[in-house]
Each structure stands twice: as structure tokens, then as C-alpha cells.
Amino acid sequence: MAKAVGVGGIFLKARDPKALSAWYAEQFGISAAGPGYLFFDGPESTGMTTFAHFPADSGYFGGGPQQSMINLRVDDLDALLGQLTAAGVRIDPKREDADYGRFAWVWDPEGNRVELWQPAI
């Protein structure tokens, strides 16, 4: 049987797609592929990607009308949070440690809450 093997892309609506893509490229080191498009390591990259569904009334994405949230797998959560703090990025003070990794949350310039995940080694 044919099956999906991962998430091929993440698509968000934005008031200014070029500026928002540039922000993600700058803050998270994601390669800019063109105006409004970013690529991680390329199609040969491996790693776990989660495709999850939350109840409509879940507060996990933060308050407000946000209907989706990106989870970015990061290599050094503390260092990245330091960089983001220095860049003036809005950061949620909450942290979560789980058996499968550490989590933190930030907001992009358009108010989307973004989850950062450093997998457990």
C-alpha cells in the first residue's frame, strides 16, 4: 500500500510573505530558495516529522485565532533562544522538558506562535 512518508511542506498565510520568509531564514538559519520559499536540508534530509491534530478548543497554539503551528526541530535550544533574544524576538518564558526532548515557543512578526523542539539524544 502506498503511504505518506513525511510532511512535504508547511504553508502559512501571511500579510507579507517575502518579509516573513526572510525572518524565518534569518532567525532559524533556513535556506531561502526564492521569494516566499524556504528549504531545510533538502529532499535527502532525514528526521522525524510530526503531523498532529489538536481539538478545536485547544490552547496549545497560544491564545487567539491561530489555527496551525509550526514545530521546528532545532540542534541547540539554549543557544537559539539566546540568538532570538538578542534579535528582539518575542519569546514565551514557558519551557517544557519531556522524555523525547525540550520545548520552547516564540512568535513570528505576524503573531504566529512557533514551537521549538530539541530532540532528546
Write out the residue ranges for each language-model feature.
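Mid-chain, well-packed structural core segment of small domains
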Residues: 63-84
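Active-site-proximal beta-strand elements of phosphoester/diester hydrolases
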Residues: 24, 51-55, 115
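Vicinal oxygen chelate
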Residues: 1-12, 81-121
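Short loop segments at secondary-structure junctions
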Residues: 14-16, 43-44, 74-77, 109, ...
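Short beta-strand micro-motifs in enzyme catalytic cores
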Residues: 37, 68, 102-104
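Core segments of cupin and vicinal oxygen chelate
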Residues: 2-5, 11-50
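Aromatic- and Gly/Pro-rich amphipathic surface segment
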Residues: 45-63
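Short, flexible turn/loop "capping" segments at secondary-structure junctions
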Residues: 2-4, 61-64
